[in-house]
């Protein structure tokens, strides 16, 4: 027999490539339009809100199929947490002309979720400050957003999805405020970062991150996100172009806080204090972590409702890949898991 914290074979899902998703989760052809935020064409109801973290204004985005109506069943809430180099909309509501559906907000709104995301301090439409927007700052951002989401939706617990440093933000928030987290998806996550090629390369700039609160984020840097792991064929070049076209309207500087944290302060999350059900999802070519590092974290999670999924032919940016439909399928299966029967 195995203990609750041991790694059972049934817990580790190596997702095969064919036939995983169809219908709403399939990649559909899109009409040619200018790149930027996903065009809704009246299909969705959207809203924006502002949270305050002291003097810092934080922009929050919401999308669902229809406007909220009195007496309707309360929809499940999915909150998406962005990473180090892109703000919320280019991460989760991107339109790539003629290339199919890339907007997670669209995908999950169609699946019946009330979908939310936010720009962290120093990103997108949120306040630019003298700070470096590190992981701890991101947790405070989420704490500021949660009361607004609860008030507008009637729910006090939400599903969270975070990718890359967004996964660290989401996990750290789940550790700090477990009563607000229903199910948690950690995508392209990093625990201790041991033997991770991307972090080894990034650490060469550690002194810069220690002495500067912003870093250059130009078109070449954005493109490198999709090529640095040695599998550029996993991505359509139009994705990097669409992200750059959208993001560079906010300038060429990004906060250094998450880079500093990931190169000098890991681990930032204690897995034994993450109490919610957890899905850990990664691409098989992702250089931000290793299987050994992530399985170390996974094996310490106290909740037996957990999954570890590796997607083939995917590098760091899972939900921007050609195989993103596989990720959407796995995420939906996890979020819609029926309640367990107590024994």
Describe each PLM feature range:
Residues 2-19:
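N-terminal secretory signal peptides and thylakoid transit peptides that target proteins
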Residues 199-281:
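Alpha/beta-hydrolase
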Residues 69-74, 78-110:
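Short, surface-exposed "cap/lid" segments of acyl-processing enzymes
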Residues 167-178:
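Short glycine-enriched nucleophile-adjacent loop
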């Amino acid at each position: 027999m195995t203990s609750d914290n041991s790694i059972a074979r049934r817990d580790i899902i190596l997702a095969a490539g064919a036939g995983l998703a169809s219908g709403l989760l399939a990649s559909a052809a899109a009409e040619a339009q200018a790149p930027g935020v996903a065009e809704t064409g009246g299909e969705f109801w959207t809203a924006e809100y502002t949270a305050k973290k002291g003097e810092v204004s934080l922009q929050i985005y919401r999308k669902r199929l229809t406007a909220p109506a009195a007496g309707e069943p309360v929809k499940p809430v999915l909150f998406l947490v962005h990473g180090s180099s892109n703000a919320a909309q280019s991460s989760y509501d991107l339109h790539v002309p003629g290339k199919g559906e890339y907007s997670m907000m669209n995908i999950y709104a169609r699946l019946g979720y009330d979908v939310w995301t936010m720009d962290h301090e120093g990103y997108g439409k949120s306040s630019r400050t003298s700070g470096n927007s590190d992981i701890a700052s991101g947790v405070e951002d989420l704490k500021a957003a949660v009361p607004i989401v609860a008030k507008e939706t009637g729910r006090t617990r939400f599903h969270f999805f975070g990718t890359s440093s967004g996964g660290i933000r989401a996990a750290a928030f789940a550790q700090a405020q477990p009563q607000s987290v229903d199910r948690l998806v950690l995508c392209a996550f990093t625990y201790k970062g041991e033997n991770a090629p991307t972090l080894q390369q990034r650490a060469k700039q550690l002194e810069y991150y220690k002495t500067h609160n912003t870093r250059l984020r130009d078109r070449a840097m954005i493109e490198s996100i999709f090529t640095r792991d040695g599998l550029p064929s996993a991505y359509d070049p139009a994705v990097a172009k669409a992200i750059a076209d959208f993001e560079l309207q906010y300038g060429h500087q990004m906060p250094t806080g998450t880079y500093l944290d990931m190169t000098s302060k890991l681990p930032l999350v204690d897995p034994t204090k993450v109490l919610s059900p957890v899905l850990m999802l990664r691409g098989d070519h992702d250089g931000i972590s290793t299987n050994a590092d992530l399985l170390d974290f996974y094996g310490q999670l106290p909740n037996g409702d957990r999954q570890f999924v590796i997607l083939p032919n995917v590098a760091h940016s899972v939900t921007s890949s050609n195989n993103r439909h596989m990720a959407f399928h796995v995420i939906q299966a996890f979020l819609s898991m029926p309640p367990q029967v107590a024994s």
